[in-house]
Amino acid sequence: HLSGITPALSYNCRRLIDKAIKAAKKLGLTVSFDPNFRSTLWSFETARDVLSKYLPYVDVLIGIEPIHVYNADGTDVKDGLTMDPSFEDMDRVFKAIDEQYHMKAIARTVRYVHSGSNNSLKAFYYADGKTYESKTLNFEIVDRVGGGDAFSSGLIYALMQNDWKHEDIVNFAVASSVMKHAIRGDTNITSVGQIKRLMNNASFDVQR
């Protein structure tokens, strides 16, 4: 798994990621990638140019910015995409990415901010030529740090379960992220069972 933060840290980190992602692909490993742009580390334009070069080696893409995916006319397929995109728009974008890079899975979260302490989260997910939309979960925030990583780790875990339906994969990833928002610190210290209970509409209760 690769994060877009690492190549932003230094030129040497960038060179290391270049070598690692190519070596992983050569070995037949599944490569997951979260572009994860941080404006405090580099410009959007530089990040887009660098991170987009990794796409031919990526199997699972988690997030669609700041990469570029060009149409035949040179425009980006994501141009005009809102913060609350429709299912049809996400389906169009996912299919355009898949057409160019032939990925196993693509995911993108959508966050609704109701207040500083109350948000909702859902995700769109693409696999096997079809787009899926998760349930929308509402939650109170204890600590937002690590929510994106919890989504990524939840998605990766779910993808490793060979018998899970696509709907369960995306709903598990969203529930994993939501669960992290109730836990202080960077790490999602919870269990698969707790995430599944939340995924299946059980009460939001972090059990210690």
Each language-model region and where it sits:
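Conserved post-catalytic alpha-helical subdomain immediately downstream of the catalytic base
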Residues: 135-201, 206-208
